[in-house]
Amino acid sequence: MSRTTTTTIAIVGAGRVGRALARSLRAHGWNIGAVVTRSAATARSAVRAIGGGHPHGVLTRRVLDAGVILIATPDDCIRDVAVKLARAGGEEWRGKVVLHTSGALDDRALKPLAHLGAATGAMHPLQTFSGRGVPLLEGVAFVIQGHGRARQEARRIARTLGGAPVALRRAAKPAYHAAGTFAAPYFLTLVETATRILVRIGFSRRRARAVLLPLIRQTLANYERFGARKAWTGPVARGDFSTVARHRAALAEWPEEFS
């Protein structure tokens, strides 16, 4: 009799995203199987953070004890992981569901496993994972690409975690991921630039952050309530280009901050 169950999930790559999803799934009743990272020490650390699972410092056939395998490695590693897993499992992959968490890559990154009969797909939670605490997943979009059972399992995971599954076609994934990058890390780049400007004119970093946070919060609240166009303020929105020229002249004194 097979030990496989679709409520047991193996995690390959237990960094910020892998740990957060595994911990949340465990809290919702899923069994955590093999947890695979690059070393035994990090695997044990991940299992402690997740609150369950079996640590492995190398790729192992034990992932096949799960019905669902989640690959949460960096994007550049996903194809290599798929190749190694295919070699390890052979025909035992038939009927398994394998998902990766990349926002930019589609299910073709898992082609070696698909060729062996696994149902493959991508499931990307559109959320930021800082590694501190468990991120809020309630209401978060889980962007899903794949077919058949892979898409069904991805939807089930998203709904289990209180997320909103969103289907996306293959060709749209890179542009989708670019949008998310503009909304989070690039946004923080702008905030950091504003912080550095204030530090240049005498603020401490702590004071600069305290000064900027109310502005940032209100801007996001306005965006949530009115949308970007109606929330847009400042000299460009007013057509006050003489003020913009003064901004440019002031910032030209510190070109290294904007290179």
Residue ranges and their predicted role:
Residues M1-R61:
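NAD(P)+-binding Rossmann beta1-loop-alpha1 motif at the extreme N-terminus of oxidoreductases
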Residues R19, R23-A27, R48, V83, ...:
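Short, well-ordered alpha-helices that flank and scaffold nucleotide-derived cofactor binding pockets
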Residues A34-T37, V98-T101, F142-Q145:
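Short, hydrophobic beta-strand segments that form beta-sheet elements in well-ordered domains
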Residues R44-A49, L113, V134-R225, P255:
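Internal alpha-helical scaffold of NAD(P)-dependent oxidoreductase catalytic cores
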Residues H54-G133:
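Rossmann-like NAD(P)(H) cofactor-binding subdomain of soluble oxidoreductases
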Residues A221-S259:
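Interdomain hinge/lid region at the active-site interface
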